[in-house]
Amino acid sequence: MTTIDKWRSKALYYTMFEFRIKGKCYVSQNYRNRQLPSKKVADNNFLSTIVDTDDEWIRQRTGIKERHLSNGKEGTTYMAAHAAEAALENAGIGADELDMIIVATVSADTYVPSTSCSVQGAIGAIRATCFDINAACSGFLFALNTAYAYIEMGMAKTVLVAGAETLSREVDWSDRGSCILFGDGSGAAIVQKDDSNVGGLIASVTGSDGTQGDVLTCKGRGIQNPFHNSKRKKDYIRMDGQAVFRFAVTMVPRCVKQILKKTETDVDDIKFFVLHQANVRILELIAKRLKVDIDKFPMNLDRYGNTSSASIPILLDELNRNHLLERGDKIILSGFGGGLTWGAMLIEW
């Protein structure tokens, strides 16, 4: 057993809520099955034993103190399925009522079947059409948009949307520039149409720039292969940190402003800006460029690190569990990441 394996946690982070299109964003208040059992996490002091770094260096540059790691048996499908089951229970519907399952992930357990198909089999959603979306840290927003489109076209009524990642197996644990950033986790939402015609998803914008794809890459994945038992250095997550920083602090304010203009919404009317949890410096500069108080930018990256497509639903769930969201609150969601991809969404809770 390696040093890393000893710190991989059985206590991964699951989250779930119910999201209704064209209606309030209704959230179940029953959290009996919200799974955050006793845990062991990899904190910054632990990372200092395997790479040349320390707690102060990591916190000052990223804001991260610790992150959850899979124990190797609890992979992306496992986490997504558990989040899905909790979301179904909180929404009060059965798995056989799902018309569709969309999983956003860049760290699938297998190439085929897709994570969504594996989740379908695990939870017994026998009627659901299933597919995955790879939009990196923007994935959850892209998946929500896709669910919305299917529902609006009358092709689905009830959709499970999940973001799930096991990034710990995609990281080069000898590279202090990247291994300090990422954690494992999952989140899921039930998306349904609500004919009350108030609240819900109001508007969204998305974008991509494939010409900048080399800025953030993962050219190999942690999938079992009898002909390739060890990963080459270039197969792990690699990124140009400065380029990603410039991209995020430029594109996110731009697409948020597009959303506000499109919906004729004043920035002061936004209760929270729920952004992908990448780096505290990125979030602080985005707030500054939008001329918004940083208190409107909730953060939990200090405890979970960058969980890619799972970060937004995890943060939304925490806000709700802490009774910080009320019916009618307007919230901006925004993701940004590899591809490059980005997006923003205005919802009413």
Functional labels for PLM-detected ranges:
Residues 17-72, 175-246, 250, 254, ...:
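Condensing-enzyme catalytic core mediating Claisen C-C bond formation in acyl metabolism
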Residues 57-78, 105-159, 288-315:
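Conserved catalytic cysteine-centered active-site region
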Residues 83-99, 254-271, 319-324:
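Phosphate/pyrophosphate-binding loops at sites that engage ATP/ADP/AMP, CoA/4′-phosphopantetheine
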